[in-house]
């Protein structure tokens, strides 16, 4: 039976990647940088991978009217149902700066407009899985995800929450089915940052007070799925923008731990959140432990 997915992205972003030949020094002028721009936001990245895998997927949230065309084109390209509400202004631009010596990212706060309730998102009925992912727009209530999780659960859907900070702390009060914090994001919930394998196992047990199934990302090392560790394969990293989102999307689609980690690693080889080739994902899965 086909599964219908809804991805909720309250904080979409245009992901700009700037590549430079060298790490800039104080006062330096970079003359030969290249840049790329791609529509993104965590739940948009999730929706894109689900669509690439052939799933029936809708994506909703709030988009600024001034630069909405890039998102409309991308959603149409992947056959994703567009449920975004258009608001005045522009969608934020996040920037990743990449050099041979390292990289860093600048994330701007999302502006979803003044909070006017969640009715504008439309009905959550008719979906089997609802995935809520990303930060909240500035000025929005910390319990926004809590309200959304409650609303989605009333429809009978499986609810996945990928958030951090106060949005996560408040969101888990509605007990989503799945959460996906990284190690640092666990601390506000359980009081410690897992570092060693026994820490992650203890964290998994503690997180079950807030959800049925915790997934804990350990960055480039790998991922813990309900206490079971899957190591990430080695790849040449180009851009980590959509790695965790692709991992989550693949797990939601197939439930295959190894394939999910392989998909997340493959995403690191692609620019600007572009989905990786499925052949690469399958090849990487062979080396996933």
Question: How would you name each of these model-derived features?
Answer:
Residues 26, 51-129, 284-289:
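Conserved N-terminal subdomain of the carbohydrate kinase-like
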Residues 48, 93-97, 222-226:
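Short beta-strand scaffold segments in enzyme catalytic cores
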Residues 5, 55-57, 82, 159, ...:
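Hydrophobic anchor at the start of a short beta-strand
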Residues 50, 182, 244:
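Short, conserved phosphate/pyrophosphate- and ester-handling motifs at nucleotide-, phospho-/glycolipid
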Residues 142-227:
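Conserved phosphate/ATP/ADP-binding segment of small-molecule kinases
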Residues 1-60, 69, 234:
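Glycine-rich phosphate/adenosyl-contacting loop at the front of the ribokinase-like
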Residues 105-107, 127-135, 162, 180-183:
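Short beta-strands and strand-loop turn motifs
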Residues 209-216, 233-288:
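Conserved post-catalytic alpha-helical subdomain immediately downstream of the catalytic base
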């Amino acid at each position: 039976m086909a599964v219908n997915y809804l991805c909720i992205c309250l904080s979409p972003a245009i992901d700009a990647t700037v590549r430079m030949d060298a790490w800039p020094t104080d006062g330096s002028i970079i003359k030969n940088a290249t840049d790329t721009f791609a529509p993104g936001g965590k739940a948009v990245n999730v929706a894109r991978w689900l669509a690439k895998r052939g799933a029936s997927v809708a994506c909703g949230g709030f988009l600024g009217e001034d630069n909405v065309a890039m998102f409309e084109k991308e959603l149409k390209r992947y056959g994703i149902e567009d449920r975004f509400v258009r608001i005045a202004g522009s969608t934020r631009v996040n920037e990743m700066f990449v050099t041979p010596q390292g990289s860093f990212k600048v994330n701007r706060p999302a502006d979803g407009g003044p909070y006017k309730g969640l009715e504008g998102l439309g009905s959550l009925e008719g979906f089997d899985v609802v995935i809520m992912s990303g930060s909240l727009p500035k000025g929005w209530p910390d319990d926004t995800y809590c309200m959304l999780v409650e609303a989605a659960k009333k429809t009978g859907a499986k609810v996945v929450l990928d958030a951090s900070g106060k949005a996560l702390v408040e969101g888990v009060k509605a007990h989503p089915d799945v959460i996906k914090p990284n190690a640092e994001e666990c601390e506000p919930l359980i009081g410690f940052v897992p570092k060693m394998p026994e820490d992650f196992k203890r964290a998994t047990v503690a997180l079950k007070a807030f959800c049925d199934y915790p997934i804990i990302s350990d960055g480039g090392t790998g991922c813990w799925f309900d206490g079971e560790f899957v190591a990430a394969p080695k790849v040449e990293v180009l851009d980590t923008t959509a790695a965790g989102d692709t991992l989550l999307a693949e797990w939601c689609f197939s439930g295959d731990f190894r394939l999910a980690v392989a998909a997340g690693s493959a995403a690191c080889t692609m620019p600007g959140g572009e989905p990786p080739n499925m052949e690469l994902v399958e090849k990487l899965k062979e080396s996933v432990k």
